[in-house]
Amino acid sequence: MGLFVNPDQSAFQSALNAQIYVDKSGLIEYTNSVLESTDAFICNSRPRRFGKSITADMLTAYYSRGCDSRDMFSSLKISQTPDWEKHLNKYDVIHFDVQWCMEPAGGPENLVDFITQNTLQELRSLYSAELPENITSLPEALSLINDATQKRFVIIIDEWDVLIRDASADTKIQDSYINFLRGLFKGTLPTRYIALAYLTGILPIKKVQTQSALNNFNEFTMLDARGFAKYIGFTEEEVKTLCDQYHRDFEKVKRWYDGYLLENCQVYNPKAVVEVLRWNKYQSYWSRTGTYDAIVPLINMDFDGLRTAVITMLSGSSVEVDVSCFQNDMINFSSKDDVLTYLIHLGYLGYDQNTQSAFIPNEELRQELTAATRRKRWDEMMAFQAASDQLLDAMLDLDTETVADEIEKIHSSYTSVITYHDENSLSSVLTIAYLSSMKYYFKPIRELPTGRGFADFVYLPKPEFRSDYPALLVELKWNHSAHTALNQIKEKKYIASLEPYIGDILLVGINYDKKTKKHECLIEKA
């Protein structure tokens, strides 16, 4: 057992000892299936507090020859698979956490030498005959050991991207680190001495001239998780089970912490779910993850459409984003799409592969991003807040003329980014118009199923505001009339869809006439 070579299972045991542990050992079935193949080079990126280190510790405990982990894994899901013991504790494992190494190394400029020297020293204690003293290259050392013994290594790097994020301006350090990783993993020889390479961090592998610096790796990210989706965060079924176990309101947990969509799998923030299960406090835990301060300068970058996109998402809508050009680093931001893509990797935004659009996943993140805009007192945000406040007040006062006028103004403000041509474009303007409502209401429910169709929008007030703010049931029409919209709400019994909600309800019909370019609104109490 060493610091980097063949660690024991104690780190993973600490995770198992926690009050709440969700079994993700099914991932090992996949890694076992690709061992000693060209598919065994894996990079899994995900946000902070999404279980990166626990996964790395689990793989170490399973494969490391430095421990006996049979009892540990015999009660986990992996033990239900055939031949689960075949690879258990059978490999020399090299595992290091780049973030931890920064301090003892004395800074990022010394990191590669620190990792290399310490790993070589530990390898010599195991393979003194195979590893001459004059060998100073880690890839060469692994190749020599493999040539003499035919043994392959499992290499696990936690927080692989620390230098990419924290030393982003120093190209010399970046180049040295990337070259170290290339020497370790790229080419024919690494396929001989590596049984499994597993990198984990926040960012995917950095691109060099549009190509991945390690293009032999299979990447599983917040943009494209594929088979890793159920191992990134907590799944909905896992959260339901935990809520039953800890007697928590699942629907409330869902509103606050759900929202990540990975391969049609609903994924929750594990850190937040664990905290609310333990303490029953529904609040944002995100600012404690260490990335919050990084987003304030990001969303204030001077890119066309960036602030508009953030405001649109804060209002409950999604925005299209081109994720293909982001270089997976901290310095090559060239457009709003690069910024939004980075925010997806950080976990501040969700991503829908089917529509190629970004959105704010849940109430927790909506609060954090709203706070970030306030830090810089956005003129755009303050103007929209004022207009939206007036719109919401007018709606609550049943002032239909003012509601129509305010929607008209917001429509005019957004003509550069939203072209009116159908009810969908009208709905985009409506979500922006109701930005102010997010203080008092949950994210609007789009097309809520009812007995005879779908309600266009439903705004449910947060519990603490239900005595002052009614639920809003909104129907939109295009080239019809507000009367038609209101009648549809009644005829199709949309109100029944709000059961078992108890509280006041406003029925809102809004129409846009393309010829007159006017909005019309009618409001009734249910």
Where are these regions (language model features)?
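Mg2+/Mn2+-dependent nuclease catalytic core
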Residues: 174-180, 478-495
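Extended hydrophobic-aromatic, low-complexity segments
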Residues: 352, 441-447, 465-471, 482-485, ...
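Active-site metal-binding core of divalent-cation-utilizing nuclease and nuclease-like domains
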Residues: 144-149, 438-468
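Conserved catalytic cores of phosphodiester-cleaving nucleases, focusing on short active-site segments
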Residues: 430, 455-461, 469-480, 492
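Metal-dependent nuclease catalytic cores in nucleic-acid-processing enzymes
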Residues: 184-191, 341-349, 431-436, 488-508
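Structural motif
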Residues: 154, 470-474, 506
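Phosphate-binding site recognition
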Residues: 1-422, 437-441, 445
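Domain-level recognition of nuclease-like catalytic cores that cleave nucleotide substrates
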Residues: 497, 503-526
